[in-house]
A protein has these predicted regions:
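SAM-dependent transferase fold signal centered on methyltransferase-like domains
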Residues: 1-431
Length: 431
């Protein structure tokens, strides 16, 4: 790809400025390709947030907006590289035997650029010629001199592919109309159909999927070929689902829940809460009727709060996994209610995979108790879990503004009492 020095100089000069302002004042003169420069400025700005390592390299070319939006973040790409390295080591390949990776759905090449570094040979396959041109330009700048770029259809390449160490795929999650699809059968290439051929070519196949998929069903669809399931989140937002396929038959795959530095792993058979995965929208939908008439004002005078010293809220990966039994067994926490997905304990837990709070006081919706609970409060962060009111309705009822250092959790306990817990957030890892 030929880009003039004037265009590169223009990009370097203006890349930290508002793209709209640059577009308004740019002079269409000389060798500067202004449309290309504007696209690159916007791409660099997105990369500086999502891919800081990439943004630190001068001369990279960024693709149009859609591939940039769909590509992995630096965190998730590095996670896959570490996973690939571990899987390679577990295969116990001869030290003298060269290792090889084939990425059949190369895209912008972010995952490939990190994963390929742990292999001796790496092949990037992409059917869009523009992305292949960008990859050929970018990979040498990123130090990937061992990378080979193939512009072809993934299934055509798979047909002629020899034996390799690992195959990686990120099936497209958009249909012909451009809308998102969330069933693996709707994704292309069709990994379910290609499963046997993929595993004939490589002993390990890693598949990246939408976090919106029902991972239990997806694992079942692969009929015992799934060795590991990785639910990867960052900033408490579930980003992707990774399946590791192997040549054996795996009744209980390893499930790994990762959220930034928090990692919890377990065997699928260890959790009896199967098929219970929860999203934020599902939690919100569990408000039973959204009316004050349904609120219980039963007094908490006889309330046994001996275990209610600390409150624990699982992170997004744990919620997606639905491994609530594992949490109770491993961390000695107690479910407030099976439908609330909040946990309490008598002791602080340093490594709980989620947020933790110190409970200051507890009240039912009894007016006298609420008044005592809210004493001195003008602001609070409010969350509802399995509660009849929305956050907005409860905030209005309690007459509190948003913000401050106090966190109120409104929920329902196992006896059906509607409770409000006044808490303070604890630092991660503190006791």
């Amino acid at each position: 790809m030929e880009i003039s020095e004037s265009t590169w100089a223009f990009i370097a000069k203006h890349r930290r400025e508002d793209v709209r302002d640059v577009a308004l004042h740019a002079k269409h003169d000389g060798d500067v390709d202004v449309p290309f420069a504007l696209e690159q400025i916007a791409g660099w700005q997105r990369a500086s947030l999502k891919l800081p390592d990439w943004a630190s390299h001068d001369g990279l070319i960024f693709p149009p907006q859609v591939p940039m939006e769909q590509c992995s973040s630096q965190f998730t790409a590095q996670y896959k590289a570490r996973l690939a390295q571990r899987l390679l080591a577990e295969e116990a390949v001869d030290d003298d035997s060269p290792t090889s990776l084939v990425d059949l759905t190369g895209g912008f090449g972010v995952d490939f650029s990190y994963m390929s570094r742990v292999f001796n040979r790496a092949i990037y396959v992409e059917q869009q010629s523009i992305l292949c041109d960008i990859a050929r330009h970018n990979f040498p700048i990123l130090g990937l001199d061992h990378a080979e770029v193939i512009n072809d259809d993934s299934t055509a390449v798979l047909d002629t592919l020899g034996r390799v160490s690992m195959i990686f795929l990120d099936p497209a999650r958009r249909d012909d109309h451009g809308s998102r699809t969330y069933a693996i059968a709707d994704c292309m290439p069709d990994v379910l159909t290609l499963k046997d051929m993929l595993l004939a070519k490589a002993p390990t196949v890693m598949v990246k999927l939408s976090p919106m998929l029902d991972w239990y069903k997806t694992v079942a669809d692969f009929a015992g070929a799934v060795h590991e399931v990785h639910i990867v989140s960052t900033g408490n937002e579930c980003k992707e689902l990774l399946l590791v396929l192997g040549r054996g038959r795996y009744a209980s795959p390893l499930v790994v829940c990762a959220n930034d530095e928090q990692v919890l792993s377990y065997k699928a058979g260890d959790n009896s809460d199967n098929h219970t995965t929860i999203s934020d929208s599902a939690l919100a939908a569990r408000n039973t009727c959204n009316t004050e008439d349904s609120l219980s004002e039963e007094s908490a005078n006889d309330f046994d709060s001996s275990h209610w010293k600390y409150l624990y809220e699982p992170n997004a990966s744990i919620m997606k996994a639905g491994c609530f039994d594992v949490l109770e067994q491993r961390f000695a926490v107690h479910h407030i209610n099976p439908n609330s997905h909040l946990f309490v304990a008598a002791e602080p837990i340093a490594d709980f995979p989620g947020r933790s709070f110190a409970i200051e006081s507890i009240a039912t919706m009894n007016k006298k108790e609420l008044k005592q609970l809210l004493a001195g409060l003008t602001h609070a962060n409010i969350a509802v879990r399995n509660f009849p009111l929305t956050v907005a309705q409860l905030r209005k009822k309690l007459k509190l503004k948003d913000g401050g250092s106090t966190y109120l959790f409104a929920t329902t306990d196992a006896q059906g009492r509607h409770l409000v817990l006044r808490t303070k957030k604890r630092k991660s890892g503190s006791l």
